[in-house]
Amino acid sequence: MSSHRQSPGRRYYPALLDLEGKRCVVVGGGEVAERKVQSLLECGAQVVVIAPQATQAIGDLARQGRIGLSVKSYTRGDLGGALLVIAAATPDVNARVAADAKRDRVLVNAVDDPEHCDFIVPAVARRGPVLIAISSHGASPALSRRLRQLIEGCVGPEYGDLAELMGRLRPEVIAIGDEDERRRIWEAILDSRALELLRDGRRDEAELEARRCISSARD
């Protein structure tokens, strides 16, 4: 765990976490907490919210059985069994959550308070299975969001479609024993008209184009 002291040279280790079925706690019930809850649910996390008051959307999720909701103030011990906690309450509460998380060896993100964070959440652009994360190491979330917007303008949904197509072809290509040959096939697909065809919505033709690349590389 980190010492929770932000230094000018601090650098975070980029990683993607598998949160499927993992207990994740969100302390706070406002709009920021609501967004954090939604993003955790998208990753399959088992979400528990702890807050004396919560937005209607959080309440609705609890009534639907999609999250756990403890309508109370945060207390020591609320992090039991959690992989991570997001502190999205008041600064005082967030500081207590961060201190408890450090003692309990639970990863903590305190909203707008990088000094108390073990991890920060990047701005994300998604295109199907493609995920592009942008971070300023907490220096300027606004800059990260602007960069995300620029990337989203350049990387269209066809890139997600191409990733899905290549994922379907992956077992067939992986079965080819030679590593250099596999690399040539992937490069040939990327250099082919497959992306252009997907951009035009011509999915079947794109797959045929990709399969031609496989056949040509093996001839």
Q: What residue ranges belong to the model's regions?
A:
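E1/E1-like adenylate-forming module used to activate ubiquitin-like modifiers
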Residues: 110-160
